[in-house]
Each structure stands twice: as structure tokens, then as C-alpha cells.
Design a protein with these regions (language model features):
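Metallo-beta-lactamase
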Residues: 1-84, 91-110, 117, 128-133, 144-199, 289-295, 299-303, ...
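Short amphipathic alpha-helical segments and helix-helix/interface helices
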Residues: 89, 130-137, 188, 214-216, ...
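Divalent metal-coordination and catalytic microenvironments
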Residues: 92, 122, 170, 207, ...
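Active-site-proximal loop/helix segments of hydrolase catalytic cores
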Residues: 105, 176-248, 258, 262, ...
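Short, charged, surface-exposed secondary-structure boundary motifs
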Residues: 110-114, 128, 152-157, 165-170, ...
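Histidine-centered divalent metal-coordination motifs
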Residues: 116-117, 121-127, 256
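Binuclear metal-ion centers of metallo-dependent hydrolases, dominated by the metallo-beta-lactamase
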Residues: 155-169, 183, 215-216, 245-304
Length: 304
């Protein structure tokens, strides 16, 4: 089962550490090729695999918790609810809307009826799900990206662009990926979630390479920042500060952890211990490592 609701990424204690260690042990026993076969299998086969493999059972239970939340939660005025689904996939629900970003999940298409728009930072399969994207298009809901459709589609941008969807005001800019040769590949999304959240600002950088000169269309302060665990260690800190192309976040949620389709640490399957160690060195005192299925609530200037 997912971590209990009483747990919080912001409370780092022995009980949580023990739970994360158990999850890591489950993950270590699941090889990448087995996980990929789970992603690509027929529905019935994948559901059977979930019943016999502990980390897949956890993966599905976390999804069910998120689905229940976005379907049934009533968001108080002045607040926002945030879930980590998997890897860098987040869902944010406000009193007046709901969006998702970088959703890569076996059952992702089930989210489509409940989200108003979808953001995709870049064209790598651990950051999108084809079935969810198609379901969104079928429902005539916006999908924001730099590649899915040509620029005649109003939600495609190859560079800086601003959008407004309902009460959400969205700024984007485009940056290089960490991998050499992938220039202008990753879109950064900075989203003001509207006055009914107290103008909560959420920023997600995908697999950006953290080059400040490319962060050209961002506000200098955000409430919650989602960076990846950087292979080029601590370059996450490049974008933290008061200079040009930098932001000052109230909270950082370090992500891209336990990407099960990657073969191991050398292939960027970062462990939970590595994530916690890295989080301790990020230049934001409120830096945490959430786990799949966990919900956080922004209220009165704090994330709990």
C-alpha cells in the first residue's frame, strides 16, 4: 500500500525512513525489462503482475489513491492539492480546476476525464503517456508541449510563450536536456494557479539542464519547484537564487526518483537514499522527496 496519509515528505523520521527502505527493497527486486513488459502488456496481464510483484502492487495502489483524490476531494478556497503520481508526474487540483504534468503511468489515460489540461515537458517516454495524450485530444482538452503538434495548434510552443486556461496563467520557456545533443528540447512550465489558491505558483522543469541563460520567461519567486535529480550533481542549485534566470522557491520537491524503466543507477534509476542525500544539499531549506501517491496541500503559505 502507499505510505499512510499520516506520513508527509516534510517529516523525515525513523518511521518514514524505514518505510522508504522497504519500498526501495521492493524496487531493487524488479528489473527494468520486467517493468517495461508490465507497461506494454495487455491489461489483464499487467493487472496479474500487480498482484504478484510488491513494487507493482504499490505502484497501482498509489495510482488508485491519486484517482480517488482528484475525483472526490473538495479543495478549500485559498488552497491547492498536489499529488506525486510517479517519477516526475504531478497532478495539481485547485478550487476551480485540475491539471497534470509529465504523466507517465501504465493507467494514465484514466486521468483524462478529471484534468482540464496536460503539460508535457519533452519527448521522452518517462515523461508522457501516449494513451493519455490521445484521450485528452479526444476530449478536446489542451495538451501543452513543444512537439506534439505543429505551431498552428495554440498549445504548441518552440520557445517562450504565455497561456491562460481558466484561472491558470502559464509561462513557458525552452531549455536543453541534460543529454548532449538535445538542445532546446525541454519546456519549463511555471503556473500561477489563480486567485482562488492565493495565487499559488508551481514550477516544473522536466529534465532541464539548469542553464540560467535559458530561463528567460520566469517570475523570480515560486511556491513549489519540481526539479529532477541532476546526473551532473547539484546543478539543480544553478537556478536557485536572485540572479538572472534564477528563482527563489519556498519549497523544492526533488523528483525523477526510482524510474523503474531504467536499468540501474548508471542508467538514472536514482535510489531513495541518493535522493534524500541530494535533497540535503539543495539550496532551499524546505527540500523534500515525496513518494508515489503522496498528497501535499498548499495552505496559508505552507506545504503540508
Amino acid at each position: 500500500m502507499p505510505l499512510p496519509n499520516s506520513y508527509s515528505p516534510s517529516i523525515v523520521n525513523t518511521e518514514r525512513a524505514d518505510a522508504l527502505s522497504t519500498i526501495q527493497g521492493y524496487a531493487d527486486k524488479c528489473l527494468d525489462d520486467y517493468f517495461i513488459s508490465f507497461l506494454n502488456g495487455f491489461d489483464q496481464a499487467s493487472m496479474s503482475m500487480e498482484k504478484s510483484e510488491p513494487i507493482l502492487y504499490y505502484y497501482r495502489s498509489a495510482f488508485d489513491r491519486v484517482m480517488d483524490g482528484i475525483e472526490n476531494s473538495i479543495v478549500e478556497n485559498g488552497t491547492a492539492e498536489i499529488w506525486l503520481l510517479y517519477n516526475m508526474g504531478y497532478i495539481v487540483k485547485t478550487p476551480s480546476g485540475c491539471f497534470a504534468i509529465d504523466i507517465s503511468h501504465r493507467w494514465a489515460k484514466e486521468l483524462a476525464p478529471y484534468i482540464d489540461f496536460l503539460c508535457v515537458t519533452h519527448k521522452h517516454s518517462d515523461h508522457y503517456n501516449t494513451d493519455l495524450i490521445q484521450a485528452m485530444f479526444d476530449l478536446d482538452k489542451p495538451v501543452l508541449s513543444n512537439y506534439l503538434k505543429d505551431t498552428t495548434y495554440p498549445y504548441t510552443a518552440k520557445g517562450d510563450k504565455d497561456y491562460e486556461i481558466g484561472k491558470f496563467k502559464i509561462r513557458t520557456c525552452i531549455t536543453d536536456h541534460n543529454n548532449s545533443g538535445l538542445s532546446n528540447f525541454v519546456t519549463i512550465f511555471q503556473i500561477d494557479c489563480g486567485d482562488d489558491t492565493g495565487n499559488f505558483v508551481f514550477m516544473h522543469v522536466g529534465d532541464s539542464n539548469f542553464k540560467t541563460e535559458q530561463y528567460t520567461n520566469i517570475a523570480p519567486h515560486v511556491n513549489v519547484l519540481i526539479p529532477r535529480y541532476a546526473p551532473n550533481a547539484l546543478t539543480e542549485n544553478n537556478i536557485l537564487g536572485t540572479g538572472a534566470g534564477q528563482v527563489q522557491p519556498d519549497y523544492v520537491l526533488l523528483s525523477h526518483i526510482l524510474e523503474m524503466a531504467h536499468a540501474g543507477v548508471d542508467a538514472s534509476r536514482w535510489s531513495l537514499d541518493m535522493a534524500l542525500e541530494r535533497a540535503s544539499k539543495i539550496n532551499c531549506d524546505q527540500t523534500y522527496v515525496p513518494m508515489w501517491g503522496e498528497k501535499m496541500v498548499w495552505k496559508n503559505g505552507k506545504l503540508n
